[in-house]
Amino acid sequence: MNSFLKDVRYALRQLTRAPGFAATVIVTLALGIGANTAIFTIFDQVLLRMMPVQNAKELVRFEWIGGFSGSMSSFGGDSQNLHNYFSYPMYKDLRDKNTVFSGMVAAVRGGVGVSWHDQAENKDAEIVSGNYFNMLGLHPALGRLFTETDNTAKNANPVVVLAYDYWKTHFNAAPDVVGKTLLINGHPFTIVGVGPEGFHSAIDRYAPGVFLPISMTDIAMPWTASRDDLNNHQSLWLTLIARLKPGVTREQAEASLGPLWYSLRAEELKG
């Protein structure tokens, strides 16, 4: 076990030094049940610190290296690889049962078809939990941003927030755009707001065209509808970002959250 952990820590250190990778500060916690070993990590990424959001230094991301067995629907490869992704039920459990974070959000990128008047194009969409903008301490340039009420029911909230740059370049910064309708993958969505100037994304260095509520995943990513991602414990697809409570360190957060994550994941795989 000790040798394995040393090898893993060395590999993680090498990854952070590799060209093209964002520098990270990584703390690891190893947990074992029988022959299975899983390592859950909470890390502070340079990309997070550079975001124009409230108290960016408090933001952390999660990853894990798995020794679990079981079926997974993951963007991240097989269960032996380093994962950035978590299921939606896992996200809700970690968000609601932790004692070390003041907030936690979930997000994923996906390509969508956007139609506005006589223009149609494919754009990146950032599909986010309802508390995404509020947890980051962001305010709209126009209209409103998402709230938890936009995640109340599956496929029941066809609303969209335009990214600031997309609003300027494709909508000519029209001040009356709020309340208008555009089509996402052929479905009508109401524009409720424009994102803040200068903010791109919490999970990618490149800005999306639009932000969509996670409750609309089946329409935003129709190829996933058969997986029922919002209820499927085996579908790993979301990046999670959390804000540390004042005075809580990454080490303390990991020591608290790691065992919770491990027990939840073990239960998921019992199925």
Q: What is the predicted function of each stretch?
A:
Residues 183-223, 242:
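Basic-flanked hydrophobic alpha-helices used for secretion and membrane insertion
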Residues 1-29:
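N-terminal Sec/SRP start-transfer signal
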Residues 239-245:
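A bilobed periplasmic-binding-protein/Venus flytrap-type ligand-binding module shared by bacterial periplasmic
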Residues 225-230:
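Short, P/G- and charge-enriched loop/turn segments at secondary-structure junctions
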Residues 10, 36-178, 183-190, 198, ...:
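Structured, solvent-exposed hinge/loop segments at the ends of secondary-structure elements
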Residues 28-33, 259:
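Residue-level recognition of pore/gate-forming positions within transmembrane alpha-helices
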Residues 31-35, 39, 245:
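Hydrophobic alpha-helical membrane-associated segments
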